Amino acid sequence: MVDFRKFYKENANVAYTVLGYPNLQTSEAFLQRLDQSPIDILELGVAYSDPIADGEIIADAAKIALDQGMDIHSVFELLARIKTKKALVFMVYYNLIFSYGLEKFVKKAKSLGICALIVPELSFEESDDLIKECERYNIALITLVSVTTPKERVKKLVKHAKGFIYLLASIGITGTKSVEEAILQDKVKEIRSFTNLPIFVGFGIQNNQDVKRMRKVADGVIVGTSIVKCFKQGNLDIIMKDIEEIFKK
């Protein structure tokens, strides 16, 4: 199983993008320049028609990608053309995996250099079949923990976790306001008592000020909605500059 610590030094810069937004050409050009960016780990959002965990901005981006014909096959074709030293993680809804076939999907993802899967709507209790395939192909199925998750459930969730722990810093959908820093610090301490895996904080982190604050709390910071916003205007040079601004030290 991949050790995500090898992809960053002091703190991980984790970004999220919707593949195919604002168009396939921009996505591909961005991925070709990924190694020149401050991003250590990139979550690749696979567009889905019912993105229940996503806020309006990401949901709209997914719709635009879908309207242009971006599907799981074009995602795989795109990634086959990409070579990068950075860690790639799929953020994908379970129905897409199930429809493609669990083993077939995980095997294909592994062949394309994917290190891990994040499946936001899949509960721990329903994840056995996917865990089995991920273990077979040495891909991490990422565990999500909320600040509101009770301690005993945290212990249960992280016991067999792989890759990293995704700590949801806000309650609800992506792009919403983050909870108090002190609450997050307490949750990180609680999680650390059960696992040595790195803990990355995401949801509600909107700008460089937020990133700098969260670096003091966790091992990595995940920025989603604000990164997707950078892509709206479509100019790659501006996109790269905006991403550098979000993650600057």
UniProtKB/Swiss-Prot annotation:
Disulfide bonds: none annotated. Its EC number is 4.2.1.20. Keywords: Amino-acid biosynthesis, Aromatic amino acid biosynthesis, Lyase, Tryptophan biosynthesis. Pathway: Amino-acid biosynthesis; L-tryptophan biosynthesis; L-tryptophan from chorismate: step 5/5. GO terms for molecular function: tryptophan synthase activity. The active site is at E43 (proton acceptor), D54 (proton acceptor). Pfam families: Trp_syntA (PF00290). Belongs to the TrpA family. Tetramer of two alpha and two beta chains. NCBIfam families: trpA (TIGR00262). This is Tryptophan synthase alpha chain. It comes from Campylobacter jejuni subsp. jejuni serotype O:23/36 (strain 81-176).
